[in-house]
Regions:
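Glycine-/small-residue-enriched transmembrane alpha-helix faces in small-molecule transporters
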Residues: 1-38, 71, 79, 124, ...
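C-terminal-most transmembrane helix of multi-pass membrane proteins
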Residues: 2, 42, 135, 236-285
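Specific transmembrane alpha-helical segments of multi-pass solute transporters/efflux pumps
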Residues: 19, 56-91, 95-96, 132, ...
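Transmembrane alpha-helices of multi-pass small-molecule transport proteins
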Residues: 29-75, 102-106, 155-159, 175-192, ...
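Hydrophobic transmembrane alpha-helices of multi-pass small-molecule transport proteins
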Residues: 49, 73, 105, 115-135, ...
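Loop-to-transmembrane alpha-helix entry segments
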Residues: 60-64, 93-96, 112-132, 139-146, ...
Length: 285
């Protein structure tokens, strides 16, 4: 692998993870209902991604896989904002980060994929981590927020499954449509109150075009230049850094069980990615 493309890929996935990791802090800085935040965040992300994607809309294939990606993405982002407003940033991102575990389960149930030993260990380890995160008391709305965050992770897992069947469709175009769907999902709960202050508008543009849009553009740059394993492992910086920014800026400290459970979930996902890469490397020999 040439050094320059590899270095660009590493810089891109690091930039993507850093960009995504600012979500929790930005959500806390905006004093608006969650679905109003999500509507504007997805609107600005849709416009940004459509602008960057440019031409190529004729290559978008209307198929069950593409529709699955669009709808599951829309639910993922809307639910994630609700979760961040209902529980701690650490709980929200760590529970959403269980998406790869849902992929294993859905692969076995929906696609009849036979689970390997690494899959079973990953699911078991993630369940232990989840129980620790969910056991931590996080206020009157924390239980609901945890459930919403877990559902967001489930939807993200469904999106990953659907992406296997939508590989012919350009990613940025599909994500732009997913953000449009997220806007439409949130619209009934926001209508007719669309008013914003100047400060709120600034943070929402930063969330949509910067935190979400730039993150996905950098991801596409990294995917073209790095092995899938390295993309997956560096992306794990997001759930690690997300609560750090919130703690430094807002003093929101994750509990001991949340940190322990989160560490288990992140390590389990990293272990599974390494085991999967080793399996494919062995098959290529």
């Amino acid at each position: 692998m040439e050094r320059r493309p590899y270095a660009i890929g590493i810089a891109a996935i690091l930039g993507a993870a850093l960009s995504w990791s600012t979500a929790g802090l930005l959500f806390k800085l905006i004093d608006l209902p969650p679905l109003k935040i999500s509507l504007y965040r997805s609107l600005f992300s849709c416009l940004f991604l459509a602008l960057v994607a440019g031409r190529g809309w004729r290559e978008v294939r209307v198929s069950p896989g593409t529709l699955g990606v669009i709808l599951s993405y829309a639910f993922t982002v809307d639910l994630f904002v609700i979760a961040n407003k209902s529980t701690t940033a650490a709980n929200a991102i760590l529970l959403q980060s269980t998406a790869p575990i849902w992929v294993i389960l859905f692969g076995a149930l929906l696609e009849r994929r036979r689970p390997r030993a690494a899959d079973i260990l990953a699911v078991g380890g993630a369940l232990v981590g989840l129980l620790l995160v969910l056991a931590e008391r996080v206020g009157p709305t924390g239980g609901r927020g945890n459930l919403v965050a877990l559902t967001s992770g489930l939807c993200f897992g469904l999106m990953m499954i659907a992406m296997r069947r939508a590989r012919a469709t350009p990613l940025l175009h599909t994500l732009a449509l997913g953000n449009l769907a997220a806007v439409l999902l949130a619209l009934p709960w926001v209508w007719p109150d669309f008013a914003l202050t100047g400060g709120q508008l600034f943070y929402l543009v930063l969330l949509g075009a910067g935190q979400l849009g730039v993150g996905y553009v950098l991801l596409t740059v990294a995917i073209r230049r790095l092995p899938a394993l390295e993309v997956a492992l560096f992306a794990l910086l997001e759930p690690v850094l997300n609560p750090v920014w919130v703690f430094l800026a807002r003093g929101e400290r994750p509990g001991a069980m949340v940190m322990a459970g989160g560490a288990i979930v992140v390590l389990v996902i990293a272990f599974h990615a390494l085991a999967t890469a080793r399996r494919y490397a062995g098959a290529d020999r």
